[in-house]
């Protein structure tokens, strides 16, 4: 269903407001570069500091600009089950192909609570849902056993796993079985190639905002069985992967895009822009990747 390089799109701002023209241009750039799908308003899209109206508008705009050329997996998570259902329902109404739903954060539910949260979403809206497990941000880990229970629900089609634990790919597969055709996507750029080798289908990527052609080429090389080329591309990208988190994300990605003249570097508080040392690290990583600024 979903595979390859999938950018977790930044949401550009200009003078405090969403820069719709810049966002539309970024979507066009991603499609031209060979990205396999698009994820608007996820963590990298600063969903936590968007108003509900802004969130929904960005999803609608992404679907409108993509115009069916690639799938749109709309960010739609919340620590309120009712709000998550509302966002998933909007994603469906807007024409998104799926919703990316993060585990509830801050309120720290147990595994039964996580299961019931996602089951409520599954039951409320007939739209494919990709689970999003990122315990470094949500505090709670969506355990493989819970993922396996959820995979048996009709609308739960996959997971974005940002734990960096590649054992999860095999463990999920062993628990779920092949008959479910459950899609596993990495949420950790530095380990994405290893994730693919373990049986993953793709990566929802921060780095792909900045280097979409290289990220797409790495995935295509792997899919073609050309591991030497895939590894060579990954070596070009590894410093950029690390630089994308040298300051709170998505500040580094936005700074890099601003250096390329593609959008402004503005982030919303409580995030702040990268400092001079971080900027130097990003510049160096871009140069090593062969990106023009």
Curated annotation (Swiss-Prot):
Pathway: Amino-acid biosynthesis; L-lysine biosynthesis via DAP pathway; (S)-tetrahydrodipicolinate from L-aspartate: step 3/4. One of its GO terms (molecular function) is 4-hydroxy-tetrahydrodipicolinate synthase activity. Pfam families: DHDPS (PF00701). It catalyses: L-aspartate 4-semialdehyde + pyruvate = (2S,4S)-4-hydroxy-2,3,4,5-tetrahydrodipicolinate + H2O + H(+). InterPro entries: Aldolase_TIM, DapA, DapA-like, Schiff_base-form_aldolases_AS. One of its GO terms (cellular component) is cytosol. GO terms for biological process: diaminopimelate biosynthetic process; lysine biosynthetic process via diaminopimelate. Keywords: Amino-acid biosynthesis, Cytoplasm, Diaminopimelate biosynthesis, Lyase, Lysine biosynthesis, Schiff base. The keyword Amino-acid biosynthesis applies. Transmembrane segments: none annotated. CDD domains: DHDPS. The record marks 43, 106 as: Part of a proton relay during catalysis. Its EC number is 4.3.3.7. Belongs to the DapA family. This is 4-hydroxy-tetrahydrodipicolinate synthase. It comes from Hyphomonas neptunium (strain ATCC 15444).
